[in-house]
Amino acid sequence: MVRWLFLLVAMLLSGCANLGCWPNCAAHTRNSSSLVEFLYPHGEAPPVQNSIPQLKIPLRVGLAFLPSSESSATGGLDAAHQEVLLERIRQRFSSRPFVAEIVMIPDYYLRGRGGYEGLQGVQRLYGVDIMALVSYDQVVHTDENNWSLGYLTIVGAYVLKGSRHDVSTLVDLAVVDPVTHSLLLRAGGTSTSHGNTTLISENREIRGAAAQGYDAATNEMIEHFDTALTKFEADVRSGKAPVQVVHKNDTVRSGSGGGGALNWPLVLMLLAAVGIRRLERMA
């Protein structure tokens, strides 16, 4: 009898707690990193682009997550998970013929290095030609049922209350040239999920849903970036891309402007032919 009285009191107290927060029994947490805030930390407007980026292929590409500006215990993207996602991106694009190597860079190398000037320091440190920066934004909404007293379940000594969570995730990949302060290419992916849990396992299940959100959004971003990269390659070949491509051991191809690039092997052959002809005349 005493045991059942104890459980009844616990249920009533739990119900009163729920009714006490009605109708505002909801909360949200946010985890994010911002490309705009990183590149322009003082809120300045992006300048007008006056110079054409020069891409020296095959490229060494630096790949990194931008440091988080907001974080929480239930949905943060930890270093181990970042490495898994970066490796997934690296494997997808490292086989491209114009890529020599994709170098994964831990996000702590970018902390305190906001702006293009700081990015150039990382570029020199790792000896890369361009930087591929991954940013993200994830919001987790949790909401206890306003009438959760009717959904109480007694298991042993526990009184369980129902809770619902919604997880919205965006992952974005932007390729920038730190030297000319140019955005070369970008693509993003999103993910949205919903779930129900109990307050006892709420944090664990929300962390799992948050991790799945990063995975799903990254997978979609990779597909979108692959499409955008294929189009970018076609624009370079047709001269529509606002870049100048320099083959490190060969010629120059210009996307917009740049004009008459020299084919140096052909020039050397012509000079050699002229020299031989002069020697023949002297003989």
Task: Annotate each predicted stretch with a short phrase.
Residues 113-179:
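Surface-exposed short loop/turn segments
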Residues 57-141:
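N-terminal segment of the mature soluble domain
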Residues 4-15, 269-273:
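Bacterial N-terminal signal peptides
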Residues 1-2, 283:
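N-terminal secretory signal peptides that target proteins for export/translocation
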Residues 17-56, 161-170, 176-188, 192-263:
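C-terminal/domain-edge helix-coil "capping" segments
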Residues 48-50, 117-119, 276:
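A generic local structural motif
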Residues 263-282:
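A cross-kingdom C-terminal cell-surface attachment/processing module
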Residues 8-11, 53, 94, 123:
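Structural motif
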